[in-house]
Design a protein with these regions (language model features):
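Face-selective signature of the C-terminal outer-membrane beta-barrel domain
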Residues: 321, 326-342, 372-507
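Gram-negative outer-membrane beta-barrel transporters
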Residues: 489, 603-608, 626-715, 756-757, ...
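Acidic/polar loop-and-plug regions of large Gram-negative outer-membrane beta-barrel proteins
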Residues: 234-239, 247, 251-258, 262-328, ...
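Outer-membrane beta-barrel translocator/receptor signature
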Residues: 161-163, 174-251, 259-263, 319, ...
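C-terminal beta-signal and adjacent terminal beta-strands/loops
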Residues: 704-712, 739-787
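Membrane-embedded beta-barrel scaffold of Gram-negative outer-membrane proteins
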Residues: 326-328, 332-340, 344-352, 576-661, ...
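Acidic, small-polar-rich N-terminal luminal/periplasmic segments of exported/outer-membrane proteins
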Residues: 23, 50-196, 587
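Structural signature of Gram-negative outer-membrane beta-barrels, strongest in the C-terminal barrel
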Residues: 256-260, 379, 398-410, 417, ...
């Protein structure tokens, strides 16, 4: 397939000598204005000239961008993806920097919550709080990458230093390594370049004490050396949830040294401090009734006050250093070596809800009590990745070959805090250990019994550092090879294979007993497929891919088998089971229209995950059964992105999926749907350019109902009532923005998120005790200066 996209097939063509041209073509703060000639066959030169005129006044220099189409990325930032996205045989949704700005989203969790096919998971005492994502029904909290290298641990992730965010859907282990059953998330960060000079400052204020200031500056020091700095400070209260807030400090510094066309060195440092006092939201009572024909289902308690306690926190710190060397020994071949060292920490003490069940016999509710969720995690990791990328011909056949090796050492210490509750209890409730004193915030009629201020000082905890209860480490050596072969301009095949040899260690301490778990194994994964271009603008593909998940592969857990921690069958040893295995089939079509400015996509897919580890009991112990479960997800995904008209820009995606447990050690689970799984999701974003200086638009998001449960397991179910137990309702949300450029250097943007002030929940804890509450309406004003 060597036609109009020939220029981007070359490995690193947008990172090496060609990077300046690609960046210059994409420069504009009002790219839609340049896009007004997008469909004018005679206007191509005018677009380039127009953007070049304001090169020094802009910070939109993403080398992967589609010139003149700010919502559309032309290529992936992952060097293993050698084709343009319109000819990549997999569903990959890309969110550009301008999309994120106009959505008004800044944390990665909020960004991904708007992506169809992705849902958000909760933390609790079985798995850690932090960013948790579920892609096409499968856990992806360990499948997060930055510039193609794994970003381990449970932390808060920001977008202030990001060019674009890529969500790959479907098993990707030949690209990503272990995990990635449902897909992976890859953030492409901003890099220094000698090809341009700019400074951009954004300062925002808004309702609920919203303040946010960012700086993005790129300075060429010489013809061969450049520096780029991104700085962040942000603070906001959670809308209409007084007492809960979020604060961010960030810095990202990049240096690029390119003394010749055959050698380049890029060094990056990244830091983020995130300090939150989270609000865990409401709760949903368990259904009541006498049988399947007499069932009452309850909606979440909408009027729950903010019950966050004094001293509650969710704090994350991230520090990483990355070095990359690019060597082009001769035309068509590039050697890339990437090294990263990182340290992250994530600690939290949070307050949730418990109880509140309704008793139809007395027409009363059980008191709602407060619960504590706590833990901390210290992560240290090192990774080195070596790639050889070659473009060459064997006769009339063109190859894009990648050979690679990777070494990684991930170490995670999970621990707890020592907590003492000093506040006076005010009720007695029944639990597993019988009756015990407790902290109740409601009476039998669900009336809150504390005032707005005193409710935050009920428990009065003192917090001290505790002990480590899980010392987790995985050391991995990987080798891989993949090739994309163009036989003709209309026919190509692609394939790859990867081997990950790993050594696993996890020393778990539970109630004074220390248990070491160790084993080693090797994972083999691959992908293969075919692509056909019946028309120049249309690409039809079929793709097959596999993925593997290792026993105990989730780093935030010890011996909690039901949450991705280590599982041990009493009759076998830890290493006697196979890794969980997944395979995916995807049939898709992509049409890149209007001179590559408008992309339509459609895909049908099926993911089957087998050899699933299943827990015994409540999932908080290592006891379980090895390789007894299986589940399946089938679905359709449709997407569009680009310029519909010269003035109207859009991105939209729709997923329609179905999930089912097809085999289990527990026969009652067979036939049920997966937990935390939304059958239907939609997101659409529009931008209309009224004049060269004025634009407005908005976003609409829909997510169908979900049902809570343990990760990668059947949703919680009441067999007596024949109903799923805890339902997270479906919802629509709408956002809007308007922007104006006062001149070439100054502009302003207004964002209003959740315009209708919808009361909605993004996910729920498996027993319904708390539901993550979505933010209520917020309005912000951002002033931008470009120099």
């Amino acid at each position: 397939m060597r036609d109009r996209n020939r220029g981007v097939i070359r490995p690193l063509s947008l990172r090496g000598a060609g990077r300046g041209t690609a960046a210059a073509m994409g420069l504009s703060a009002a790219l839609i204005a340049g896009g007004a000639q997008a469909q004018d066959a005679n206007g191509e030169d005018e677009v380039v000239l127009d953007t070049l005129q304001i090169e020094d006044a802009t910070a939109d220099v993403n080398p992967n961008a589609q010139p003149g189409v700010p919502y559309k990325a032309r290529t992936s930032g992952d060097l293993h993806r050698v084709k343009p996205l319109s000819e990549t045989p997999q569903t990959i949704q890309v969110l550009t920097e301008q999309q994120l700005e106009e959505q008004g989203a800044t944390d990665l969790r909020d960004v991904l919550d708007n992506v169809p096919g992705v849902t958000i998971g909760t933390g609790e005492n079985g798995n850690a709080f932090g960013d948790r994502y579920i892609i096409r029904g499968h856990e992806a909290r360990s499948d997060v990458f930055v510039d193609g290298l794994r970003d381990p641990g449970m932390t808060t992730r920001e977008t202030f230093a990001v060019d674009q965010i890529e969500i790959t859907k479907g098993p990707s282990s030949s690209f990503a390594g272990r995990g990635s059953t449902g897909g992976a998330v890859n953030s492409i960060t901003k890099k220094a370049s000698t090809d341009y000079q700019f400074t951009r400052v954004d300062a925002g204020i808004g309702t609920d004490d919203y303040y946010r200031v960012t700086l993005d500056a790129n300075v060429p020091l010489t013809d061969t050396l450049a520096l780029r700095a991104n700085l962040l400070y942000g603070y906001e209260e959670v809308p209409n949830r007084n007492f809960s807030d979020r604060e961010r400090y960030g810095a990202a510094v990049s240096a690029a040294f390119k003394p010749s066309e055959v050698f380049e060195l890029v060094l990056d440092y990244y830091h983020l401090t995130a300090n939150d006092a989270p609000d865990l939201g409401g709760y949903v009572p368990r259904p009541t009734g006498t049988g399947p024909d007499d069932v009452t289902v309850y909606e979440p308690w909408d009027d729950v006050p903010n019950y966050t306690q004094n001293g509650d926190f969710l704090d994350s710190d991230v520090d990483t250093v990355t070095g990359r060397i690019y060597i082009t020994p001769f035309d068509g071949f590039t050697i890339v070596n990437s090294t990263r060292y990182g340290e992250t920490s994530n600690g939290y003490v949070l307050t949730g809800l418990r109880g509140g069940a309704y008793d139809p016999a007395t027409d009363t509710y059980a008191p709602v009590t407060l619960s504590t969720h706590q833990g901390n995690q210290e992560v240290e990791y090192f990774v080195n990745q070596f790639n050889v990328l070659g473009e060459f011909a064997t006769g009339a056949v063109l190859h894009n070959l990648i050979l690679g090796a990777e070494y990684s050492n991930l170490q995670v210490a999970n621990g707890t805090y020592d907590l003492t509750a000093n506040g006076a209890t005010n009720c007695v409730t029944a639990g597993r250990g019988g009756l015990s004193p407790n902290y109740c915030i409601t009476d039998e009629n669900r009336n809150v019994i504390f005032g707005e201020n005193e409710i935050h000082s009920i428990v009065q905890r003192t917090i001290a550092d505790g002990s480590v209860d899980s010392d987790w480490q995985v050391e991995t050596l990987s080798v891989y090879a993949m090739d994309t072969v163009d036989f003709t301009d209309w026919l190509s095949v692609h394939g790859g294979i990867r081997m990950d040899a790993f050594s696993y260690s996890n020393v778990v301490t539970s109630r004074g007993t220390v248990t070491p778990y160790t084993y080693s194994d090797a994972l083999w994964n691959g992908h293969a497929g075919i692509g056909v271009k019946p028309l120049e603008e249309v690409y039809v593909y079929f793709n097959y891919g596999t993925a593997k998940n290792i026993n105990g592969g989730e780093s935030d857990l010890g011996g909690n088998c039901g949450y991705g921690g280590i599982c041990v069958d009493d009759g076998t040893g830890i290493g006697d089971g196979s890794s969980e295995s997944s395979e995916s089939f995807e049939l898709g079509v992509k049409a890149d229209l209007f001179d590559d400015r408008f992309l339509l996509t459609a895909a049908a897919f099926q993911i089957t995950k087998g050899d699933v580890f299943e827990s015994a009991g409540d999932g908080y112990s290592a006891g379980g059964s090895l390789n007894t479960g299986e589940n399946r997800v089938r679905g359709l995904e449709f997407g569009l992105v680009g310029n519909i008209t010269p003035q109207l820009l859009a991105q939209a995606a729709l997923t329609v999926m179905d999930s089912e447990i097809t085999d289990s050690n527990d026969p009652d689970k067979i036939g049920r749907r997966l937990s935390n799984f939304a059958n239907t999701q939609f997101s659409g974003q529009l931008r209309y350019q009224v004049t060269d200086a004025i634009a407005f638009g908005g976003t609409a998001t829909y997510k169908s109902a979900q049902y809570t449960g343990q990760p990668d397991d059947a949703a919680s179910y009441d067999s007596n009532l024949d109903i799923f137990t805890y339902r997270v309702p479906d919802y629509w949300t709408f956002d809007a923005f308007a922007s104006v450029d006062f001149n070439q250097n100054f502009g302003a943007r207004v964002n209003v998120t959740n315009i209708g002030n919808e009361d909605y929940y993004v996910s729920g804890y498996r027993s319904g005790h708390f539901l993550y509450k979505g933010d209520e309406r917020r309005a912000t004003l951002t002033l931008t200066g470009k120099f």
